[in-house]
């Protein structure tokens, strides 16, 4: 505790909406944090060593990524893991995945336009729309004994609304855990292109897969589509 980490100090409010008066049936040391975004595994030595090396420079000013090596490392990872390549000028840094999502929704959608996503959904897709006073449109996934699939007829119907200008995809899907197959992504891509929509593909959890699963970036399926934004995060890679 006393780290200001969500994993140790913030989970009571974040998950349980609890204040300091709420009593939990277990002691803190008995909890094992295994939520997808913040598992209780130690940071690798190579990362710790890199931070220590940076600390030794003793100068901490405004920071941006200026070195080509960052792009080279990230691009090499995407090529080796997903056989996916992209131009260096298309890699843009942000101050965080959630702030970037909020900013993109407000930038892409005009005040009278709508945001479409699959439900159940990562809650911040709706929060981002709410923050910009944009309407949310939900296309419910089909639940067959815990295996979720896309209702393409419903998705296409809702995407056809000219006021629905942005589709947010979660790939792999949160919270169902579905890793979308290539044919599924192609069908999604066809609907997006047909309606000339913007699409944000949230691929944050792309490397947290079971051994028999394979992540396919939407950008690999739609390599020439100019209204596609892929969200990724190096700290989970």
What are these regions (language model features)?
Residues 168, 199-200:
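Walker B beta-strand of ABC/ABC-like P-loop ATPase nucleotide-binding domains
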Residues 203:
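Walker B catalytic acidic pair
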Residues 60-190, 207-208, 212-225, 229-230:
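Conserved core of the PLP fold type I
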């Amino acid at each position: 505790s006393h780290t200001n980490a969500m994993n140790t100090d913030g989970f009571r409010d974040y998950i349980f909406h609890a204040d300091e008066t709420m009593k939990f049936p277990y002691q803190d040391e008995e909890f094992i944090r295994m939520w997808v975004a913040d598992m209780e595994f130690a940071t690798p030595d190579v990362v710790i060593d890199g931070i220590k090396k940076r600390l030794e420079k003793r100068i901490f000013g405004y920071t941006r990524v200026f070195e080509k090596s960052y792009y080279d490392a990230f691009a090499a990872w995407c090529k080796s893991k997903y056989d996916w390549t992209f131009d260096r000028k298309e890699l843009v840094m942000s101050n965080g995945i959630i702030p970037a999502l909020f900013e993109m929704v407000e930038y892409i959608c005009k005040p009278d336009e709508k945001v479409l996503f699959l439900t159940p959904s990562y809650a911040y897709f709706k929060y981002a729309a709410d923050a910009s006073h944009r309407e949310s449109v939900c296309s419910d996934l089909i639940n067959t004994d815990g295996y979720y699939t896309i209702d393409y007829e419903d998705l296409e119907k809702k995407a056809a609304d000219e006021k629905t200008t942005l589709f947010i995809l979660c790939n792999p899907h949160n919270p169902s855990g579905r890793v979308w197959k290539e044919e599924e992504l192609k069908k999604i891509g066809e609907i997006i292109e047909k309606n000339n929509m913007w699409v944000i593909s949230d691929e944050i959890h792309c490397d947290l897969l079971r051994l028999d699963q394979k992540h396919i970036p939407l950008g690999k399926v739609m390599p020439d589509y100019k209204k596609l934004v892929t969200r990724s995060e190096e700290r989970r890679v």
